A protein has these predicted regions:
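Charged, amphipathic alpha-helical coiled-coil/dimerization segments
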Residues: 86-146
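Short, low-complexity, charge-dense intrinsically disordered segments
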Residues: 159-166
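N-terminal leader segment of winged-helix/HTH proteins
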Residues: 1-44
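N-terminal helix-turn-helix DNA-binding core of bacterial DNA-binding proteins
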Residues: 27, 31, 35-77
Length: 166
C-alpha cells in the first residue's frame, strides 16, 4: 500500500529512487508553502518577489543596494529586477538613485512607506510562519535547516548560480 508522497500523488508505481522521491517531495512542499504565503501576502497587496525585495532593502539599511545585488540576494531569481522595482517605486515603497561614483550603477532603497508596510506585515507573517511549522518541533526544524543547506551545497546549485551569472 502506497504511503507518504506516493499516496498523496495517488501513484501506484513506487518512485524509481530515494532521490526522485525527495526531489518531488521538496517541490510539492515548496509549492504548498508558496501558495499559502502568496495568499497571505496578497492581503497586503504584494507578491512574494515584491515582499522579498522590500525585506532585502530593509536589511540593507538607508544606503540601499545596487540593483544587481538585489537580484543576487532574491530567494527566487527574478531576471527583471528593473520592472520589479518599477512596480514598487510606483507604489512609493522604493526609491532609486544613480551612484555618484559610477552613473551606470543604480541603487534601490526602501522608503518610509515601504518600511511602514513591512512593520505592519512583520507580526502577522511571523505568526503565520510559526503556525505553518510549529508541528515539526525545534529539533526537527534544526535538522531540516541543516538538510536543506546540504542540498543547496550540492553541485547542481553551484552550476545554476554560475549559469545565471552568465
Amino acid at each position: 500500500m502506497p504511503r507518504g508522497l506516493q499516496a498523496e500523488l495517488k501513484q501506484k508505481i513506487p518512485f524509481t529512487s530515494r532521490e526522485a522521491e525527495a526531489y518531488l517531495s521538496l517541490l510539492r512542499t515548496a509549492d504548498a508553502l508558496q501558495t499559502q504565503v502568496e495568499a497571505k501576502l496578497k492581503l497586503f497587496g504584494l507578491t512574494g518577489t515584491q515582499y522579498n525585495a522590500l525585506r532585502i532593502l530593509r536589511g540593507a539599511g538607508p544606503e540601499g543596494l545596487p540593483c544587481r545585488e538585489i537580484g543576487e540576494r532574491m530567494i527566487t531569481r527574478d531576471p527583471d529586477i528593473t520592472r520589479l522595482l518599477d512596480r514598487l517605486e510606483d507604489r512609493g515603497f522604493v526609491q532609486r538613485t544613480r551612484a555618484k561614483h559610477d552613473r551606470r550603477v543604480i541603487y534601490g532603497k526602501i522608503t518610509a512607506d515601504g518600511l511602514k508596510l513591512l512593520r505592519e506585515m512583520d507580526v502577522p507573517l511571523e505568526k503565520f510562519g510559526r503556525e505553518m511549522l510549529r508541528h515539526v518541533g525545534q529539533e526537527k526544524l534544526k535538522q531540516l535547516i541543516e538538510l536543506l543547506e546540504l542540498v543547496r551545497a550540492g553541485k547542481a546549485f553551484h552550476r545554476r548560480d554560475a549559469e545565471s551569472a552568465e
